UniProtKB/Swiss-Prot annotation:
Single biological process term from Gene Ontology: translation
Name of the protein this chain belongs to: Large ribosomal subunit protein bL27
Keyword Ribosomal protein annotated: yes
Organism: Synechococcus sp. (strain CC9311)
TM regions (residue ranges): none
The keyword Ribosomal protein is annotated on this UniProt entry: yes
NCBIfam families (alphabetical): L27
This protein's GO CC annotations: cytosolic large ribosomal subunit
């Protein structure tokens, strides 16, 4: 006979590391070329003028300038777009 109660096993008890997604440069901020503007999954924010898109949908600045967010009408829903305006 067992002298201790057997411990059960569980299939839970693990978690993934956070991916640190989100906006990295907000509207009105000045950025340099190559700066990451937004880390995202999918294109919830579309790239605009002077903004590139990486293979993981990360948006980054192509030139130095000021970050600007804008809302654009696309079909029945509004989409967000981020642009980098050249600094004067």
């Amino acid at each position: 006979m067992a002298h201790k109660k057997g411990t059960g096993s569980t299939r839970n008890g693990r978690d993934s590391n956070s991916k640190r997604l989100g906006v990295k440069a907000y509207g009105g901020e000045s950025v340099t070329a190559g700066s990451i503007l937004i880390r995202q999954r999918g294109t919830s924010v579309m790239p605009g003028v002077n903004v590139g898109r990486g293979k993981d949908d990360t948006l980054f600045a192509l030139t130095d300038g000021i970050v600007k967010f804008e809302s654009i009408r696309r079909g029945l829903r509004n989409r967000k777009r981020i642009t980098v305006a050249a600094a004067e």
